[in-house]
Amino acid sequence: MPSNNLIKNALISVSDKKNIVEVAEKLIINKINLFSTGGTAQILKKNNIPVTEISDYTKFPEIMDGRVKTLHPKIMGGILGQKQKDQEIMKLYNICPIDIVIVNFYPFEKIKNIKKNDIDNVVNNIDIGGPTLVRASAKNYKNVIVIVDLDDFQSTIDSINNNTMNMEKRFNLASKAFEYTSYYEQIISQYFIEQNSLYKKTNNSLFPNEINFSFIKKQDLRYGENYHQKSSFYIEKNMCDSGTISTACQIQGKTLSYNNISDSDIALECVKQFTKPACVIVKHGNPCSVAVSHNILESYLSAYNSDPISAFGGIISFNCKLDEKTAQTIINQQFVEVIIIPEISKKAVKILQKKQNIRVLVTGKLQNNTVGLDLKKITNGLLVQEYDSHNIDYNSWSFVTKRSPTKKELKDSIFCWQVAKFVKSNAIVYGSDEITIGIGAGQMSRIYSTKLANIKVKDQGKNIIGATMASDAFFPFRDGIDEAASVGISSIIQPGGSIRDEEIIRAADEHNITMIFTKKRHFKH
């Protein structure tokens, strides 16, 4: 490895020129000669920073509107040259060794997102020279320091000054450089796959033959699903959407656990569906209670009182601003792991600070941005599907029984159907007045999910005559209808589609139960 005091030449070629003048000034202070391409060189010259333009060094002009400028043997030789091995050939062809390369790429992703359908404009922002410089520099990391993130510059220049720019630091920068080029190629590839499907008039762009995803670590977690499992939380690069757990800001509380994040995501995605003030309480991957009301306090109290036993140690999410009264009520009522809100009042913050262990996540404005792909890892494989969207197609619903639903029953059917989608299959949800009354989740047979919901109702001594039942999938037998009727259910919403649908409808008619077929299933495994 070359000594740090032999670092003499730096090549700068950046599309994003923010802070590049300050960077160049520090290199000059360290008596490092600068080489640069046209646009970057002009900015440096305007700021009275001495710089040699690449075209002056190579004796070959930038051509084709700047598309060809750094791809030259004197540049690539200066980067790929190994000083202990290639000195003679470099001297023969007057190749200057390049010790530092600072590069960032054309903003392909930004242009793609703004002008997705302007293919010529998007393609014109595919960087060719930049990735070539970076890959060459990273390959020759023993001789070249490569910087693709200016946040790394100050620590690098400090290491050079302190003569501590060791092999580990060089290798780490090279590793980061390859991550940068890999992600850049990935988003270009994905764009071409999408556009190729348009040319072919096919609908396969969502599921290409080869698929890659790029995530960055947001934080290490306390542990995984269990104490003996280590875990970390990774998020998508360059996210701009608010209103997700991935983009939420934790304003207080202990470090999040794997289960905290998983349950919080379910709670938040569920509560997003509602426009009126709503509260969702989640435990072990399932909503244990959900309520919608005219204000946040009433929605919380209704949700909590729906199943106070299960709410203990739960995750609570709201779709509206948390006020001081509701915050105080929560800490008076129960032990809670996480509270998720789009915004919070200053007084509510002070109240929750009395319980410093409570994790509080502020998401910003909520929006239904859960679109695209849903992934599930299996051993040596990955299952990929479209996300089960929140949209309800009322026009496809059918009233299949002799009695049609009342206005209240229809309102409760919509509410229960929205909740059922987030409950593990087999899922049964009882609700009335937009409050869940009993939830049967995760049983291997639908009848036992129904019985579980009945047990919860009976244990709490609730009178649920006139309540609504939602089932995430069809009823294979009439026993579920009879069981629901035994506690007073008056309306049922389900997908339909069983070979015994006629028998199921007759059973509902026998009990004077109104039934809606949605023609859409919501299994959740």
From Swiss-Prot:
GO cellular component: cytosol
Keyword RNA-binding: no
GO MF: IMP cyclohydrolase activity; phosphoribosylaminoimidazolecarboxamide formyltransferase activity
Pathway connected to this protein: Purine metabolism; IMP biosynthesis via de novo pathway; 5-formamido-1-(5-phospho-D-ribosyl)imidazole-4-carboxamide from 5-amino-1-(5-phospho-D-ribosyl)imidazole-4-carboxamide (10-formyl THF route): step 1/1; Purine metabolism; IMP biosynthesis via de novo pathway; IMP from 5-formamido-1-(5-phospho-D-ribosyl)imidazole-4-carboxamide: step 1/1
Pfam family, one: AICARFT_IMPCHas
InterPro entries in UniProt: AICAR_Tfase_dup_dom_sf (IPR024051), Cytidine_deaminase-like (IPR016193), MGS-like_dom (IPR011607), MGS-like_dom_sf (IPR036914), PurH-like (IPR002695)
Keywords associated with the record: Hydrolase, Multifunctional enzyme, Purine biosynthesis, Transferase
BP GO terms, sorted: 'de novo' IMP biosynthetic process
Keyword Nucleotidyltransferase attached: no
EC numbers on record: 2.1.2.3, 3.5.4.10
Residues of the MGS-like domain: 1-148
Catalytic activity: (6R)-10-formyltetrahydrofolate + 5-amino-1-(5-phospho-beta-D-ribosyl)imidazole-4-carboxamide = 5-formamido-1-(5-phospho-D-ribosyl)imidazole-4-carboxamide + (6S)-5,6,7,8-tetrahydrofolate; IMP + H2O = 5-formamido-1-(5-phospho-D-ribosyl)imidazole-4-carboxamide
NCBIfam families registered for this protein in UniProt: PRK00881.1, purH
Entry text on domains: The IMP cyclohydrolase activity resides in the N-terminal region.
Family: Belongs to the PurH family.
HAMAP family for this protein: PurH (MF_00139)
Protein's name according to its UniProt entry: Bifunctional purine biosynthesis protein PurH
